[in-house]
Curated annotation (Swiss-Prot):
Pfam families: Lectin_C (PF00059). Glycans are attached at N104, N144. It is a single-pass type II membrane protein. It comes from the Eukaryota. Changing G96S: In allele CD94-01 and allele CD94-03. Keywords: Adaptive immunity, Cell membrane, Disulfide bond, Glycoprotein, Immunity, Innate immunity, Lectin, Membrane, Receptor, Signal-anchor, Transmembrane, Transmembrane helix. Disulfide bonds join C69-C81, C72-C83, C100-C185, C163-C177. Residues 79-186 form the C-type lectin domain. SUPFAM superfamilies: C-type lectin-like. Residues 32-190 are extracellular. Immune receptor involved in self-nonself discrimination. In complex with KLRC1 or KLRC2 on cytotoxic and regulatory lymphocyte subsets, recognizes non-classical major histocompatibility (MHC) class Ib molecule MHC-E loaded with self-peptides derived from the signal sequence of classical MHC class Ia and non-classical MHC class Ib molecules. Enables cytotoxic cells to monitor the expression of MHC class I molecules in healthy cells and to tolerate self. Primarily functions as a ligand binding subunit as it lacks the capacity to signal. This is Natural killer cells antigen CD94. The chain crosses the membrane at residues 11-31.
Amino acid sequence: MAAFRTTAWRLISGVLGVICLVLMAALGVLLKNSLTKRSVQPGPSADLQEEYNLHEEEESCLGCLGSGCYSCQEKWIGYQCNCYFISNELKTWKDGRDFCVSHNSSLLQIQTRNEPAFMKFSTSFYWIGLSYDEEHHAWLWEDNSTLSQDLLPFFKSVNPKNCIMYNPRGRILDAYCEKKFRYICKQQLI
């Protein structure tokens, strides 16, 4: 009877050992296939490339923000080589723009979809520095640069006669320019 128990345990442990080996082999094959597929991709995705570019820009600014060579004004937020003022005060689009100009900045100009990532917690809408130029039939930023193609789809359904508001969660709205909303100023450091 004792020999039977020993033999049964040996048989069970042998079967379990074989199952473990098969599972480890399968895991190895899956891991190898996963790594191979990643290395076959032609290049980084646009989002990864953008994230890399932002990281490079951030690295170039590490020595600047707060070190004395560049610093943001009081109540302004430093982020990726820029200073941002996020208002709590409600103003018309023009009054918001005038405030920004008086502080050597402009209403927010969004250059990438991820630019205002530092304020994703907010649910408010803010005036930004984009308006429709009737003469050129194009959306222009305050510096007269055109709206980038990757941002253009967000502006298809807005009324060109209105001013543009942005929500940090990625929503774009238009509103009568004389309405009062919060606004965001942006000052480029570099």
